[in-house]
Structures are given as structure tokens and as C-alpha cells.
Amino acid sequence: MSRVAKAPVVIPTDVEVKLDGQVISIKGKNGELSRTIHSAVEVKHADNQLTFAPRDGYVDGWAQAGTTRSLMNAMVIGVTEGFTKKLQLVGVGYRAAVKGNVINMSLGFSHPVDHELPAGITAECPSQTEIVLKGADKQVIGQVAAELRAYRRPEPYKGKGVRYADEVVRIKEAKKK
């Protein structure tokens, strides 16, 4: 049985929560996020807290309640503080630049790679080999970071490619004669 769902999500005073049937909307200084809640989960909003419990008749009720609680907690953190994800470009001639909502990258291909950012996500390049993604939605930030990394994954022999800042790339030893 999940114990995650038993802990309530505390809502700060500057965050507004609206519960409309199975759709919950959370609004804060960094924007507004909404999500549809699984039908097996019952959400109650009282005393600046969100509490989660399974509905009767669902086998996976506690599991869904725990998942929903984690998603709601991420939404509250997103609209108050926001999320960041850092990427590094490792390789000779690999560089990135941001123009509006488009990230332009040179990754060793015969053409530059342009990636358009979705709404609510901003990017900046502190240096030519670093990309910092910022936004309120944790899932969208992770998805965009994964898409950028997929253009040129770190290869195992020299480690060249696009990697997360906290990623450790295991380098293989070259074949010996």
C-alpha cells in the first residue's frame, strides 16, 4: 500500500487551486497548470491542503492516489519556484544559441539543428556549450531536454554529444591490437 498518498500537499498562500470535477487547476506566479485526475482518486481541498484517497471499488486506488499526489506536488512547486534542467554540449565545434523560442545547435552535422520550444518553456545559453531550460511544468521540461539530447546522444568512446549536466557518461576502452 502506498504511503505517499497519505501525506497532504501543502498549498502556499500565493497559490490558487480550483477543483472542477476531475480537473484540477493550480495557478501561481509562474503560470497556471491543469491536469485531469484519475477516476480512482478522490481529492479534497481544505485548510490550504490537498488530501488524496482512493475511491471504493478500485484495485489500484492507493497507487493512483500516490501518483496523483506526486503530480500535484510537482505542479505546486512548478507554479511557485519553477523547474530548471541544464544540458551540456561536449565536442569540437558543438555550440548552441537561443533566438526567441528557437534553440539553434551545431552538432557536427552538415546542417544546423533548430528546435522550437513549446509554450511556457524558456531557454538561455550562459555559454556556447550550455543550455538551461526553465519552466513551470516538470514533465514538459524533461521532454524538451530529452528531445535535445536525442539529436546527438553522448557516444561511449569519446563522450561527445548532448548530455544532462548531472549525467555521468561511462567511457569504453578502445579496442587494442
From Swiss-Prot:
Keyword terms, alphabetized: Ribonucleoprotein, Ribosomal protein, RNA-binding, rRNA-binding
Listed GO biological process terms: cytoplasmic translation
A GO cellular-component term linked to this record: cytosolic large ribosomal subunit
Domain of life: Bacteria
Gene Ontology molecular-function annotations: rRNA binding; structural constituent of ribosome
Cited Gene3D superfamilies: Ribosomal protein L6, alpha-beta domain
Family matches, as HAMAP family: Ribosomal_uL6_B
Subunit structure: Part of the 50S ribosomal subunit.
Protein family: Belongs to the universal ribosomal protein uL6 family.
Its biological purpose: This protein binds to the 23S rRNA, and is important in its secondary structure. It is located near the subunit interface in the base of the L7/L12 stalk, and near the tRNA binding site of the peptidyltransferase center.
Name of the molecule in the record: Large ribosomal subunit protein uL6
